[in-house]
A protein has these predicted regions:
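Walker B catalytic acidic pair
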Residues: 132
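Long, compositionally biased low-complexity repeat segments characteristic
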Residues: 450-463
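A conserved beta-strand element that flanks and buttresses the S-adenosyl-L-methionine
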Residues: 129
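Extracellular/cell-surface secretome signature
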Residues: 470-475
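Non-catalytic architectural context of zinc metalloproteases
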Residues: 1-52
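Zinc-dependent metallohydrolase catalytic domains
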Residues: 52-126, 138-452, 479, 487-501
Length: 502
């Protein structure tokens, strides 16, 4: 790794402030790849721990090391960001429990912990920094995903960010050594690699990080999920864990197949990274995106690995309901074949748009359909998966309604999505934001509904958990009811609930 020979040693948190033992003292590395401008950064490093200069240097090290290590997996013609030549990084963008990518910058915020009031800086977590970088990387590779009106594509954008964070820390030898010692080689348990943004999660009173790649979540049609509450919901950050969990499962299964050694872990890491990048480059932007990407990964494994890991991929995707038994039976057919270079008429960048009516607005949206972004003309082989236009139209309308329900859409650029009145009311994404929309006031100290039970989607809101028989009775030690019910009554007991107070 190239370093700046004139720089001083800087303390670098490799993972997250919650794991301060996972650190290194290093010179500032040289960015060999896509350009970054980190505000408040020093020229030589060696800043005081906790200062904005140190935070900037620490973020620069994480970003640069991540880019340098992953560069070999990028399509060869990707040399710059999707919408800017120089990605600007703001270490202290303001006070908020947030961080986001907006096509020109990465912005990191700070806030007071809901647990103990301590000031939490999102920029100090390599997990958060490289997650946001992941959005920028995916946008550079697949800019056609940015405005696609499809819930699963949005959820995958979040998953990809988490996977970049995970794959990034697995580039460090000290991480690999420590995780193998901590887990005794058994990666099928909660660990500091699978847990993402642990300090941030603890500050929001969420155990095992904001999200955890080690999970058992399975695919459910997101239209059938509640929009709020605990567990899997129709919210892109929440739903992203389905794909992240499947990917982590595949990584661990390959690691186990190869022998559960340090060398096996490194080899498995590189195998799944290559599978991910190759597949993301080829996969069409379909409505049922998780299903399409799963098929693409299996086809890609056949092409680059001679089907060495296809049985693992199929088993995991079936277990997670991302692929059905029918999908598996048909996988020898052409619907998952890689199109040959001669059929480059299939390769195009999507700009197919329709108008949908939602929330008293007529809005122009970009459809998710059978689109491909041709990264390398005459070299990219796309995947021949096709979806029905009717599905694309219905998904566009459903997606816009989802955005309105989460207050993610507006007539000003303060929202995640902007209705451009000067351009036929075109719906345009402004930013990929870690807005934690699945957090509700029941779970946050200092909020009026704190420590009350979150009711399901058909009766959303908070009510006293356990529904005490009298107003003076102490509530039971349960936070989230798993069943749907019409209101609080004495029949709702702790046995109806599945999530104990943290």
């Amino acid at each position: 790794m190239c370093v700046n020979a004139t720089s001083k040693l800087t303390l670098h948190y490799i993972n997250d402030p919650s794991t301060p033992n996972i650190k290194e003292n290093v010179n500032l590395p040289v960015n060999n790849f896509m350009k970054l401008k980190v505000n408040n950064m020093t020229d030589v490093g060696g800043s005081v721990l906790g200062s904005v200069q140190w935070q900037a240097d620490n973020a620069y090290i994480s970003l640069t090391n991540c880019l340098n290590s992953l560069q070999k997996f990028f399509p060869s013609n990707i040399k710059k960001w999707a919408a800017t030549n120089n990605l600007v990084v703001y270490p202290r963008a303001g006070k908020d429990a947030n961080a986001y990518y907006d096509r020109s910058s990465l912005k990191f915020f700070y806030f007071n912990s809901y647990a103990d009031g301590k000031l939490i800086y999102s920029v100090e977590s390599s997990d958060i920094v490289t997650h946001e970088l992941g959005h920028a990387i995916l946008d550079a590779i697949r800019p056609d995903f940015w405005n696609a009106a499809a819930f699963e594509i949005g959820a995958f954008h979040e998953s990809f960010g988490d996977l970049i964070a995970l794959l990034n820390i697995l580039q460090y030898d000290t991480v690999i050594n420590t995780i193998l010692i901590d887990t005794k080689g058994n990666l099928r348990q909660n660990n500091f690699v699978s847990e993402l943004a642990e300090q941030f999660g603890s500050a929001l009173e969420i155990p095992h990080g904001l999200r955890n790649a080690f999970n058992s979540e399975s695919y459910v049609n997101p239209d059938f999920l509640p929009s709020d509450g605990k567990g899997l919901i129709k919210e892109i950050h929440s739903f992203s864990v389905v794909w992240t969990g499947a990917f982590y499962d595949i990584f661990v299964s390959i690691y186990e197949k190869l022998g559960k050694s340090k060398a096996s872990l490194i080899q498995a890491r590189d195998i799944v990274t290559k599978l991910l990048f190759e597949s993301v480059t080829k996969v069409p932007a379909t409505v049922k995106f998780f299903n399409s990407l799963a098929k693409c990964m299996i086809a890609t494994d056949k092409k680059i690995n001679g089907k060495l890991y296809s049985s693992i991929l199929i088993d995991v995707f079936k277990k997670r309901n991302i692929l059905t038994a029918s999908d598996v039976q048909q996988m020898s057919l052409s619907n998952i074949s890689i199109l040959s270079e001669e059929k480059e008429n299939y390769l195009f960048t999507s700009n197919k748009e329709i108008f949908v009516n939602s929330n008293n607005n007529k809005i122009k949206v970009q459809l998710a359909c059978d689109s491909f972004h041709d990264n390398e003309k005459n070299k990219l082989n796309a995947l021949s998966i096709f979806s029905d236009d009717i599905d694309s139209y219905q998904e566009a309308e459903s997606f816009v309604n989802y955005l309105f329900s989460k207050d993610l859409i507006g007539n000003d650029k303060k929202h995640n999505w902007f209705i451009d009145k000067d351009n036929d009311n075109k719906l345009t994404r402004i930013k990929m934001q870690s807005d934690f929309g699945f957090i509700n006031n029941c779970t946050i100290k200092g909020q009026p509904e704190y420590k009350k039970c979150w009711k399901p989607d058909n009766n959303s809101g908070c009510c006293p958990y356990g529904c005490p028989k009298t107003e003076n009775e102490e509530p039971t030690n349960y936070k989230s009811c798993a069943v749907r019910y019409s209101g609080c009554n004495n029949n709702v007991t702790s046995s109806s609930c599945n999530n104990k107070i943290l």
